[in-house]
Amino acid sequence: MSKLQHHSIGEVEPSIAIVGSGPAGCYTAQTLHKQWPSAQIVIFERLPVPYGLLRYGVSPDHQGTKAIARQFDRLFAEASVHFIGNVEVGKHISVEELQDAFDVVVLAAGLGADRPLPSLAGDAVYGAGQVMRWFNSHPDEQSFAPGFGATTTIIGNGNVAMDVVRLLAKHRDSFTGSDLDPQLIEKQPSRIHVVGRSPASAAKFDSMMIRELAEIDDAVFDVDVVDEPGHEDKRIHAKTKALLDLTAARAVPSPRVHVSFHFGWTPESLEPTGDGRTLRLVNTESRLAVKLIETDSVITAVGFGSGLRHEIDRVRFESAASDLDNGLLDTGLYCSGWFRRGPTGGIPANRLDAKMVCTRIIEDVASGAITPKKRGLEELATHLHPDTVDFTGWQRIDAVEASRTEHGRCRTKLPDIATMLDFARNRTHERTTDDTYRKQITDTVGHKEKR
């Protein structure tokens, strides 16, 4: 596929709608804005706040990664790029309405449902994705109240699993500079098991994640089997060496938490026993050896998929013209990020994905497959409800959160949508009427684009 083309003087620019303000959506907007600096680009987000995975999926103590949002702040400062939050596509407006209003529509809403393990079920079995959203004070998880107990078992050995291990094992005083609500770690387990089907050398986590665990100075770690380092693959060598370094004997007079890694074991069942539960594991290779773990709770970290109530079904928009290899769903309709390729790869992969999909969009406009003629947000404004949030509204929310730095936190997130909306609209009790707010939307967009 060709490289991104340079903008031609006099070229008519398309109006563009992007669904989802996470990394996939923002990188898509960033790339298309570079191609067409004056094109109207509108990013729609279900929540009143932007940045999706960066805000609610990245671990609260990984603020360096979350700082990527600052480059997206600069994107939204551009006159032709707009954020419209608190709009759920599929509920408040349809994809078809977006297609009627915009020349190009890109679906980049991600996939957030935890992949279930059919063999494990019960009221003490939690998905790691939901747990991470809870740690990040996601408004969808306000009623979520996990009871991890004194002993918890994490199924999975990818980076998300290691994030959960670290957040549960770190001392509560070690979260200075994070945006983790202190109330969420008032009760931490003293025993953590980590179970993975593959051997240590094939585990999905990065060695850096293990080195972070080694920084917890009042924890002890053990592992049942680790391949000796020396593998010709440098990543595998680094991974096994990090594990051996982690589990090497070290003086911890009074360990606060004990973490055990079990590689090469597959969970088979979870049965209630007395006050707790017994997790039955079978050896992945032999299928003969059995291991039993007494646990109070289980957290599954085995990947993601579709299934959350608000998610858009990609299959519904596939057509005979679809070419998912480069993000095409139908004429003028595209998809990017996890929504396109499935739940694989992190933020850097989403950046590459966005560039690839944008190349196809640019080629379609250049070839005449898409003829720019639609007015974008101006056509759609009458369909929007009065509680949408623009980027200025998000900046108000951001300022309030950043001002709340109790307990050494870098911010304290507003936990519910109603409170977010109050601060976004700078209101207390009065509500703007539908017609007045729709006029505000079109006036604001017009003023911004004339700057």
Swiss-Prot record:
The keyword Flavoprotein applies. The keyword Secreted does not apply. Coiled coil: none annotated. InterPro entries: FAD/NAD-bd_sf (IPR036188), FAD/NAD-binding_dom (IPR023753), Ferredox_Rdtase (IPR055275), Ferredox_Rdtase_adrenod (IPR021163). Its cofactor is FAD. Its EC number is 1.18.1.-. Involved in the degradation of cineol (eucalyptol). Catalyzes the reduction of cindoxin (CinC). It comes from the Bacteria. This is Cindoxin reductase. The lineage of its organism: Bacteria, Pseudomonadati, Pseudomonadota, Gammaproteobacteria, Enterobacterales. GO terms for molecular function: oxidoreductase activity, acting on iron-sulfur proteins as donors, NAD or NADP as acceptor. NADP(+) binds at N157, G158, N159, V160, R197, S198, G345.
